[in-house]
Amino acid sequence: MATEVSTRFIFIKIDALSTLHFIDEGGALSMNGDSIEFLIGKSSLDKGLLKRATKLFTWLFSPEIAKQHLSITRSTESNVYMTDATRYKYIFPEYLLVRYVGTKFPDMKIVADATFKRRNPKGDVIGMLDLSFKEVRVKEVSETKAIELRDSNPGYLLSTTYRESESLPVVSKP
């Protein structure tokens, strides 16, 4: 079993949905460590993988990293909980390639759904975040395969390196 820390590559296939509805800024919720941990905790992942998956996706959806790969559409709509709510729909890329410094990363398949609601003191819903990992797959790939993937679509590769031993992203120069 390889426990050597080295530069590796993780290929992530993402089939996910996320929408945020809120009435005012006080109702806005975000994808953060707590919501991601809750979402991934609802999956069938082995307990030993939960911490690694949570850390990876918390990093991936942190604001400084997410701006590299997520896009957001904004609209106004009503739903059963809120009238004329602002709606943000997060558009995930289908694939991501992440440069990674750490030990061998296990293959993972994550399927999970979670909804978070924020209420005002009267009990009315003023914010709602829906997260759905319809099917998210994580697989470590060789450097040769990573180069092939990058060459086929340069947009797959994030410009930031994920370092599992650190809590903050480190920007690397390509």
From Swiss-Prot:
Keywords: Apoptosis, Host membrane, Membrane, Viral envelope protein, Viral matrix protein, Virion. It comes from the Viruses. It is found in: Virion membrane; Host endomembrane system. GO terms for cellular component: host cell endomembrane system; membrane; viral envelope; virion membrane. The keyword Membrane applies. One of its GO terms (molecular function) is structural constituent of virion. It is a peripheral membrane protein. Plays a major role in assembly and budding of virion. Completely covers the ribonucleoprotein coil and keep it in condensed bullet-shaped form. Inhibits viral transcription and stimulates replication. Homomultimer. Interacts with nucleoprotein and with the cytoplasmic domain of glycoprotein. Most abundant protein in the virion. This is Matrix protein. It comes from Northern cereal mosaic virus.
